[in-house]
């Protein structure tokens, strides 16, 4: 599974097929909802198995299954299952409505958008995981959207943007740890360089949300705040911020929702089971997409698709700026092919370090570029865990969210400008 692979352009065919079917067909039809993403992945997965050099058909299928059953993929599936169960049980006991009422009563109308973005930034920065932040805040964001009339995909995109901010900067984020270790620099030094690039973007996005929020007016709710029903979300946030494993966090949230529901009389024991079952079923499509993507991307790796990208990106580098651009492109393509920014960093980090050493790129700058571009791509691809999770919890499509992802897009632009204009100067000369 992990042997050296020869660069092979044709190994990228499944990815090209997927993009062609899903994006081009949708653009031709003028409707992104007409092409189910599951069908696009099914076709591209069949192509991946058909063109693979893995030997007999049963061996190629076995290779595909091993990719789908990768430990990272299985962990994502477990999180999706628990997240679906928690979201539905919290909704059934009234925890979502109670939390939304609390947020609407505390935050002025004009601060709803900016407040949600800042909350997502702070939570993800504290807990070091974008997925955990999305799990915790998306149901609340959807509830606020429903009660205020705000566009639901827009509200969910705010949460995703804030979640990617923390994923990029947090000291305890997997991406920060891998980026600094592979480049050989301290976390605090990487944080300084990274902050100079992305914090101005976060401030700009917050200002944009403040202006957009100034037009929002809500009708004061006559419903009193049910503090007891807010407890499941408070527990989830506190345990997440304390660094508890996200699966334990979700299990505690599910149990707490049941206890609160029984105490308040809003749900019976068997209704709790039914709510969990419904929530898990709602994640079915998301899980199918994740498994198909995992298998397809493993076939691409096995047949040399990623090796081909790495070879092409590192062949013609001749300057420090070119080296930084190749590092950015390298990790971006790796993430595009793996849909996992941590894995993308592990794959591209050693190569990026070699490029940085040969052309005199500051390790702090290369670590920042690796982390930032991996989070940029991860935050916008429709088959990444973040958008899939957010879309699943909000019952919308990833494409519906993508058009409103202000922060991830601007983060990518800012990182590209930092390369082109040699910023920050101290770490670019």
Predicted regions and their residues:
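Juxtamembrane and boundary regions of transmembrane helices in multi-pass small-molecule transporters
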Residues: 32, 161-164, 168-223, 228, ...
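Interfacial loop-to-helix junctions that mark the boundaries of transmembrane helices
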Residues: 4-7, 27-40, 67-71, 103-108, ...
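Hydrophobic alpha-helical transmembrane segments of multi-pass integral membrane proteins
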Residues: 77-86, 107-140, 313-351, 370
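Membrane-interfacial loop-to-helix junctions in multi-pass transporters
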Residues: 70-76, 101-118, 145-155, 199, ...
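Alpha-helical transmembrane segments of multi-pass membrane proteins
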Residues: 110-123, 149-166, 322-335, 359-380, ...
